[in-house]
């Protein structure tokens, strides 16, 4: 029962984390930047936001964005993390206690769960490296006022995927635990009904 609960917890945690990684990859609010000193930017109300895909500046009510081409490693890591999440989540779906694929043994589910756990940990490592590397590189080029919501979503998503992957790998039981979730039903023998016969 404990192993079953841990399998479900690992799946839910990993799924939420993967969504966070996708949100981080697709949005541009990684860091809030300033082209001048911070007091000057606040006075002029000219703050920018920088992400994987564009560098945007809001000045005098106008929003200007220019595409970025110089952060390809971070972009590649986040795309890899997002792509790795799909097979990992699909594999985890097939090992949930409520899903059974034919007459497969518990060891088959166990192997799929282990593979999903490894993919989730790789996903988390890619996201962690990218979300730490990006603000360090951005700080060298411009003044960073604060971190954006995308970066926080990336950190939280990466940690959740790391926790989910570790739970699946280490705590969700062995091959026997995956086999215990199978239930077999046999057709019961029906007792014959004896109706009273009326003799006239």
Curated annotation (Swiss-Prot):
GO terms for cellular component: bicellular tight junction; plasma membrane. One of its GO terms (molecular function) is structural molecule activity. It holds the Pfam family PMP22_Claudin. It is a multi-pass membrane protein. The modification Phosphoserine is found at residues 190-191. It is found in: Cell junction, Tight junction; Cell membrane. InterPro entries: Claudin (IPR006187), Claudin11 (IPR003555), Claudin_CS (IPR017974), PMP22/EMP/MP20/Claudin (IPR004031). The chain crosses the membrane at residues 2-22, 76-96, 116-136, 151-171. It comes from the Eukaryota. Residues 1, 97-115, 172-200 are cytoplasmic. Keywords: Cell junction, Cell membrane, Membrane, Phosphoprotein, Tight junction, Transmembrane, Transmembrane helix. Residues 23-75, 137-150 are extracellular. Gene3D superfamilies: 1.20.140.150. Interacts with tetraspanin-3/TSPAN3. Interacts with OCLN. Plays a major role in tight junction-specific obliteration of the intercellular space, through calcium-independent cell-adhesion activity. Belongs to the claudin family. This is Claudin-11. It comes from Pongo abelii. The gene is CLDN11.
